Curated annotation (Swiss-Prot):
Protein name listed in UniProt: ATP-dependent 6-phosphofructokinase 1
Entries under PANTHER family matching the protein: ATP-DEPENDENT 6-PHOSPHOFRUCTOKINASE, PHOSPHOFRUCTOKINASE
Binding sites annotated in the UniProt record for ATP: G55, R118, S119, G148, D149, G150, S151
Function: Catalyzes the phosphorylation of D-fructose 6-phosphate to fructose 1,6-bisphosphate by ATP, the first committing step of glycolysis.
Region feature (Interdomain linker): 421-435
GO biological process: canonical glycolysis; fructose 1,6-bisphosphate metabolic process; fructose 6-phosphate metabolic process
EC identifiers of the protein: 2.7.1.11
Natural source organism: Caenorhabditis elegans
N-terminal catalytic PFK domain 1: region residues: 1-420
Length: 814
């Protein structure tokens, strides 16, 4: 037995451990209702209550709004329980019936408008008896709990005790038997609201993305002063015993060192840290950023604080070192577009999950898996979360990282590779070969473009490749504008928007292709990464289709979609679109605020996106807009006239403003000016109309953490894939000849997977005239937009969503 065990390699042991974890502790999701027809009043006469508990997080208000309005639309009576479990115990004015207007204009607010608290009394039986009394007296038997694992565990304990609690209340005449009979059991659906992202079973928790944005904006600000004085900064971030925020912030900010609980530092961490910082300075870097999770520890379980790190750097290297503890600023401020959208989607799904439950149903949590709304068992998720805590208590760090999920593992692996200064001669993917690889940007600039190039360059250097950047797109390629990269050349690229390589929209033509081929041959380019929008995708098709004529194009090629329009087939999300939606939401928030004090004003906001309505739809949903006009959903003058009636009816009941988002090419005749003129004419003295054309500001300044990290990880994945193809298509005389369709691919997110799709296969899914994919997942969100905004809608969806039965992969980019 011992002899057999000794033959197992660490890799095999790792595989066995992962397989066992998946087998015995897998969390099996159930498909949600998103994208299906939503009929009004289908749950008429039913009652539910919403409460937020534990620490607050940005995006909770979005969830409260979504649950309230979807439930009212479906015919339910909705109660809001103020101050969490404390309010449930106190009763009285702490439990109020909600109306449609109760949750108006809250989607952009941080925190939670219904308050949150940590209740010690609810942990006692008497506290739970009081809470049960208040719920029974109001006929509440369905609860939506928005909080962390502690709040959700408490809710489940309450559910399990319900029968005994009710019997005791009836026996002691605290409630009537008739009232108790109406609520024989309670059902619970959870939404995880936590900035820590420490809950197993969901890829993202509500508030995490906003916290990351706050952290990254703070680090970006610190970088400027650190460079000026050649300082080292130690940044402490929240997260309790989960290192997610610290790890992802380190990736997005290009931090030099990161301390997290799941990957403890060795005993000699002071020497390792100082050697790394010294090495970075010797490469010409003027500053150092070190990120410390508040729960950071060493291998012995001893805490590592920001002050410990500062002392080590100051004593050993004599650097001017400062500590910045971000604290509760990470919880504050307006929620990001991602968290607003997540709250909307999860909240709507929670209503359907709750209403479809029976007495035998187990409580569930609404989760996002890849880009799909699913329902997962609450108890299984809590159990898995507790397993992480146990693994860390047992100092089983490998298991702790595995239990955090594939995304966490991928983040950690990528961070380790991208922060290495010395590349390995052996055990790399090149396997002794010296490949020449190149990267080019094509199309309009977008957030995350530089992050992708940085990641590709450093991963290529790590794997012993010579890597070139091609400047100014195909014009630069034709002119031989090549730059050979060193490791330090791409320092601080991730935090910057635009394109440092330069990018243009021109495509390869019959006239330029001989020049392109000649330059590829001259520099012996053996693999090419294209980072860009629809032009990058179209260019790859052109190059692949001309391989017979130009052998120089017979190399592995890969496209990473990077465009704010999100109009490239083969992926659900493009790099840059998250940055753009956040920019739009921030501007809409200011536009809405400008109406404060004025009466009856209608705003028309025009977004970019070409013919694609992605930006218009998602920014409308994320900002609480009333409608979005897009090309994919044709509209007529009659539709606009009907909207005027909606505007008038809303203003008659107290609304002071109405906001419409219009995609720039939604209709060639019904232009933004036309819509304004029609509204002005029909509205007459009832309201005034103003137009805001947002323009190129939507391309963003600093990329969001989402776009930085998605660009980083997609480029790393693309380089690995290209190296595999290089080795597969290498001839005996060390030439690369790649002719198959599978060597010209697009790397995208499809449902819950990251997929390489041959670009020639995507042609049939493409409307080249309008530069659109034939199927767009986000059209499934259009019904939700109308329900949450109008309170009257007949909706149906033809959007196609991916099956949740597919095996999960590292499709989420955080």
């Amino acid at each position: 037995m011992d002899a057999d065990a000794s033959t197992i390699t660490p890799e095999e042991l790792d595989f066995i451990r992962q397989r066992a974890l998946r087998r015995f502790d897998s969390i099996v999701p159930t498909a949600g209702r998103e994208g299906t027809e939503i009929a009004s009043d289908i749950f008429k006469g039913r009652t539910l209550a919403i409460y937020t508990s534990g620490g607050d997080s940005q995006g909770m208000n979005s969830a409260v709004r979504s649950i309230t309005r979807m439930a009212i639309y479906c015919g339910c009576k909705v109660y809001l329980i103020y101050e969490g479990y404390e309010g449930m115990i106190e009763g009285g004015d702490f439990i109020k019936e909600a109306t449609w207007n109760t949750v108006s204009d809250i989607i952009q607010q941080g925190g939670t408008i219904i308050g949150s608290a940590r209740s010690s009394e609810f942990r006692t039986r008497e506290g739970r008896l009081k809470a049960a009394t208040n719920l029974i007296n109001r006929g509440i038997g369905r609860l939506v709990c928005i909080g962390g694992d502690g709040s959700l565990t408490g809710a489940n304990t309450f559910r399990l005790e319900w029968t005994d609690l009710v019997q005791e209340l009836v026996k002691n005449q605290r409630v009537t038997a008739a009232a108790a009979k109406k609520i024989p059991y309670i059902q619970i659906v959870g939404l995880v609201g936590s900035i820590d992202n420490d809950f197993c079973g969901t890829d993202m928790t509500i508030g995490t993305d906003s916290a990351l944005q706050r952290i990254i904006s703070s680090i970006d600000a610190v970088v400027a002063t650190a460079q000026s004085h050649q300082r080292a900064f130690v940044i402490e971030v929240m997260g309790r015993h989960c290192g997610y925020l610290a790890l992802v912030a380190a990736l997005a900010s290009e931090a030099d060192f990161c301390f997290i609980p799941e990957w403890p530092a060795p005993e000699n961490w002071r020497d390792v840290l100082c050697d790394k910082l010294s090495q970075m300075r010797s490469e010409g870097q003027r500053l150092n950023i070190i990120i410390v999770a508040e729960g950071a520890i060493d291998r012995d379980g001893k805490a590592i604080t920001a002050e410990d790190v500062k002392t080590a750097v100051k004593e050993k290297l004599k650097y001017d070192t400062r500590v910045t503890i971000l604290g509760h600023v990470q919880r504050g401020g307006a929620p990001s577009a991602f968290d607003r959208l997540l709250g909307c989607r999860m909240g709507a799904e929670a209503v359907f999950a709750l209403m479809e439950m029976t007495e035998e149903s187990e409580p569930c949590v609404i989760s996002i898996d890849g880009n799909v709304m699913v329902r997962v068992p609450l108890l299984k998720c809590v159990e898995r979360t507790q397993m992480v805590q146990k693994a860390m208590a047992d100092k089983d760090w490998t298991t702790a990282v595995m239990l955090r999920g594939r995304s966490f593992q991928r983040n950690l692996e990528t961070y380790k590779l991208l922060t290495k200064m010395r590349t390995v001669e052996k055990d790399n993917l090149s396997e002794g070969h010296k490949f020449n690889v190149a990267v080019i940007n094509v199309g309009a600039p977008a957030g995350g473009m530089n992050a992708a190039v940085r990641s590709y360059v450093r991963m290529a250097l790590y794997h012993q490749c010579t890597v070139y950047g091609i400047e100014d797109s195909f014009e630069g390629l034709a002119n031989g504008s090549f730059k050979q990269f060193k490791w330090s050349d791409v320092t601080n690229w991730a935090m910057n928007g635009g394109s440092f390589l330069g990018t243009q929209k021109s495509l390869p033509t019959e006239k330029t292709m001989p020049q392109l081929a000649a330059q590829l041959k001259k520099h012996n380019i053996q693999a090419l990464l294209l980072v860009g929008g629809f032009e990058a995708y179209h260019s790859t098709i052109i190059l692949a289709e001309n391989r017979e004529k130009y052998p120089e194009f017979c190399i592995p090629m890969c496209v990473i979609p990077c465009t704010i329009s999100n109009n490239v087939p083969g992926t659900m999300v493009s790099l840059g679109s998250d940055t753009a939606i956040n920019e739009i939401c921030q501007m809409i928030d200011k536009i809405k605020q400008s109406a404060t004090g004025t009466k009856r004003r209608v705003f028309i906001v025009e977004t970019m996106g070409g013919y694609c309505g992605y930006l218009a739809t998602l920014s409308a949903l994320s900002s609480g807009a009333d409608n979005a006009y897009i090309f994919e959903e044709p509209f007529t003058v009659q539709d606009l006239s009907d909207d005027v009636d909606v505007i008038l009816s809303k203003m008659e009941v107290g609304a002071k403003r109405y906001l419409v988002v219009r995609n720039e090419w939604a209709d060639k005749n019904l232009t933004t000016d036309f819509v304004q003129n029609l509204f002005d004419s029909e509205g007459k003295k009832n309201f005034t109309t103003r137009v805001n054309v947002l323009g190129h500001v939507q391309q963003g300044g600093s990329p969001t953490p989402f776009d930085r990290n998605m660009g980083t990880k997609l480029a790393a994945r693309a380089l690995e894939f290209l190296l595999i193809q290089l080795k597969e298509n290498l001839t005996a005389d060390n030439k690369v000849i790649a002719k198959s369709a599978h060597t010209a691919t697009l790397l995208g997110l499809k449902g819950r997977k990251v997929v390489f799709t041959p670009v020639q296969d995507l042609k049939k899914e493409t409307d080249f005239e309008h530069r659109l994919p034939s199927e767009q997942w986000w059209m499934a969100l259009r019904p939700l937009l109308r329900v949450l905004a109008r309170h009257r809608s007949t909706v149906e969806s033809s959007a196609i969503l991916e099956s949740v039965e597919e095996e999960s992969a590292d499709s989420h980019m955080f």
